[in-house]
Regions:
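N-terminal small-domain helix-loop-helix segment of the aminotransferase-like
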Residues: 5-95, 102, 276-279
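Structural signature of PLP-dependent enzymes
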Residues: 56, 254-258, 277-298, 326-328
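Conserved PLP-anchoring active-site segment centered on the Schiff-base-forming lysine
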Residues: 106-128
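A short helix->loop->beta-strand "cap" motif at the edges of active sites that frequently abuts
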Residues: 112, 133, 190-194, 221-222
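Active-site phosphate-binding strand-loop segment of PLP-dependent enzymes
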Residues: 136, 140-207
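PLP-dependent enzyme catalytic core of the Aspartate aminotransferase-like
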Residues: 153, 335-344, 350-381
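Active-site PLP attachment segment
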Residues: 210, 216-253
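Conserved glycine-rich beta-strand-loop-beta hairpin in the small C-terminal domain of fold type I
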Residues: 270, 274, 289-297, 308-321
């Protein structure tokens, strides 16, 4: 019998697949995995059909449709006042997770190190380790989940080749300030460290806050891959569409890998998003999600959960349950799904060592009736 190498077998099945499967098994309301349960913008559907009818059904150019890359450049000029070369700095990818893996593969060699802020999206560390490199986790400081910059300085060695960050942050909902970026720039100034900026929730910031992108920081932009997701901005996660913005030399390295993996990305979907971005009528996802966050926070007051800080960004809200149970967060999340019909994500899953502060993550990117049904269940605790 042929024995295949067990590449990254230690990670097992992701917590998102586990909890969504458990929700389906028990007929629970799924507030675990980060996806909306409401329709996409009707205009986006129309543009997708239009793309098919017009013949956008064959392979797209390897970097992505020129019309989409230009639409992205125009969008960033309008929203962030930055100039981006659509031909040499933007590459369309089959989702942001693919973009993160490809960027890490362009950066890392065996024996290198990459700094990860925890809690962290669960693909980061496997992506690093699958490239033969070592992940160096640094915990964010609770309860505000801020960066301890002294720990960052202490963690840097001659082998440090990358730092990955995520703002707005999954799962905590925090956002980086310009001061954070300035501090990071000072720390990496005389190094060969590359920054990987995961900005998939960049359009989801609340309470008048402003998302500050790495692309707006000239010094850091020169050493950064910035990763984005159409799924988060257009509520179409199943399309698996994202993009990477990086300096031309970084983009060349990224595309050398991309051409031999995915090569190209769903062509009619690229057409549809390009038309949607260029139409000037794209829905205000920020206002929609902020209203959902506020509604969910108001509803949560009728439950025994404790909210220490409303999410500043993303579509996730953390909550503690000290007045309900002393179970660990994984056991509690499983119990909540099986016995009370609401699926969440235990935050310990976002730590390499399963550090457990007894916090769970809710996704509020749901229809009002979905959130209200979930609260009805949770209010019985």
């Amino acid at each position: 019998m042929i024995q295949l190498p067990q590449k990254h077998a230690s990670t097992g099945t992701s917590i998102f697949a586990i909890m969504s499967g458990l929700a389906q098994q028990h007929g629970a309301i799924n507030l675990s995995q980060g996806f909306p349960d409401f329709p996409i913008d009707e205009q986006l559907s129309t543009f997708l059909e239009e793309g098919v009818r017009l013949g956008f059904n064959q392979y797209a150019p390897m970097p992505g449709l020129p019309m989409l890359r230009q639409a992205i450049a125009d969008d960033f000029k309008r929203r962030y006042a930055v100039d981006i070369d659509a031909d040499n700095e933007i590459t369309i990818s089959p989702g942001a997770t693919y973009g993160i893996y490809t960027a890490f593969t362009a950066i890392l060699q065996p024996g290198d190190e990459a700094i990860v802020f925890e809690p962290a999206y669960d693909s980061y560390i496997p992506n690093i380790e699958m490239n033969g490199a070592k992940a160096v986790p640094i915990p964010l400081t609770a309860p505000d989940f801020t960066v301890d910059w002294n720990r960052v300085k202490a963690a840097i060695t001659p082998r440090t080749k990358a730092i990955i960050l995520n703002t707005p942050h999954n799962p905590t909902g925090t956002i980086w300030s310009k001061a954070d970026w300035d501090t990071l720039a000072e720390i990496v100034r005389d190094t060969d460290i590359t920054i990987l900026s995961d900005e998939v929730y960049e359009q989801l910031v609340y309470d008048g806050a402003i998302h500050y992108s790495v692309l707006q920081h000239p010094e850091l932009r020169e050493r950064s891959f910035a990763i984005y997701s159409f799924g988060k901005a257009h509520n179409n996660t199943g399309w698996k569409m994202g993009y990477c913005i990086a300096p031309p030399t970084f983009t060349q390295a990224y595309r050398r890998l991309h051409q031999f993996t995915s090569f190209s990305v769903n062509t009619p979907a690229q057409y549809a998003i390009a038309r949607h971005l260029s139409s000037g009528t794209a829905s205000n996802v920020r206002a929609i999600m902020e209203a959902k966050r506020d509604h969910f926070l108001s509803l949560l007051k009728n439950t025994p959960f404790t909210i220490h800080k409303p999410a500043q960004g993303s579509y996730f809200q953390l909550a503690t349950y000290e007045s309900i149970s002393d179970k660990g967060d994984l056991e509690f999340a499983q119990w909540l799904t099986q016995e009370h019909g609401v699926a969440t994500i235990p935050v310990s899953a976002f730590y390499h060592n399963r550090h457990d502060d007894k916090i769970i993550r809710f996704c509020f990117a749901k229809k009002e009736e979905t959130l209200e049904r979930a609260i009805e269940q949770l209010s019985r605790l």
